[in-house]
């Protein structure tokens, strides 16, 4: 088959293509795939991981925003392997249209660095989250999600209401083309049996977390007062009612503590604050 033309990675899309076959095999192995499962790959790029997934007995859908990739390298892969390609921005994808209605699926992705967090928010906190996600992110972002070194970031405080997370392994820049300037980590995100926040409240919960981290170097009382535009005395009462020390920093607040605070704020008459 004649090779199709592809102009190369696009910086604006955060493209760093994973070439390392050893890493690709490790990622897929950690997904614990069984015959007949539904698999969604986001950002298949040049199709290196797609090729391996498509050789398995799974129902594979690959979503790629880059039309040049879809018409070029991915068309070559699909010519000899069976899977579905959706040429679309995954952030605009209607999840009710993929696989069968109500069917479970697993998410596998080398996430684009520039929108990885937004993609995880959309999929993991929505009404149709994957049962398991094995994804690549910048190591620093991944560590903030899993509460490494006792520090929980915005994404960790948010996603912890929907999934259990752990870092599986790190990946060197040399495994990508072009190589990123930072180390990457592969995350395992397993869906909770019941989310701690209902999907219809996920957006407000995320905004509340952002408010709580508005001044991350300050004490939680000052950060929340600033983010929610409340008097420190009001925040002190909420913290006391939630059994949280007001001098702690936002990064030390656990997921369950964030949820307790959110529930308190949500019951206020002026809950439009969030």
PLM regions and their residue ranges:
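An accessory alpha-helical subdomain
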Residues: 185, 189-191, 197-237, 242-245, ...
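Catalytic cores of RNA-modifying enzymes
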Residues: 1-211, 251, 260, 267-274
């Amino acid at each position: 088959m004649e090779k199709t033309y592809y102009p190369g990675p696009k910086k604006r899309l955060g493209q760093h293509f994973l070439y390392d076959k050893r890493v690709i095999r490790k990622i897929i192995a950690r997904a614990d795939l069984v015959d007949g499962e539904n698999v969604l790959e986001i950002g298949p790029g040049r199709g290196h991981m797609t090729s391996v997934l498509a050789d398995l007995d799974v129902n594979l859908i690959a979503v790629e925003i880059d039309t040049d990739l879809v018409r070029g390298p991915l068309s070559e892969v699909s010519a000899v392997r069976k899977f579905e390609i959706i040429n679309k921005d995954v952030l605009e994808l209607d999840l009710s249209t993929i696989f069968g209605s109500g069917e479970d699926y697993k998410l596998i992705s080398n996430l684009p660095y520039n929108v990885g967090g937004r993609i995880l928010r959309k999929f993991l906190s929505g009404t149709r989250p994957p049962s398991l996600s094995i994804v690549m992110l910048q190591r620093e972002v991944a560590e903030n999600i899993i509460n490494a070194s006792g520090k929980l970031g915005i994404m960790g405080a948010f996603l912890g209401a929907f999934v259990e997370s752990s870092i599986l392994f790190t990946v060197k820049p040399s495994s990508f083309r072009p190589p990123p300037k930072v180390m990457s980590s592969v995350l395992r995100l397993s869906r909770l049996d019941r989310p701690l926040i209902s999907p219809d409240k996920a957006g407000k919960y995320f905004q509340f977390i952002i408010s709580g981290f508005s001044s991350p170097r300050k004490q939680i009382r000052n950060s929340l007062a600033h983010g929610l535009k409340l008097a420190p005395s009001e925040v002190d009462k909420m913290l006391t009612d939630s059994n949280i020390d007001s001098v702690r920093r936002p990064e030390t607040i656990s997921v369950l503590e964030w949820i307790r605070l959110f529930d308190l704020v949500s019951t206020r008459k002026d809950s439009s604050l969030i």
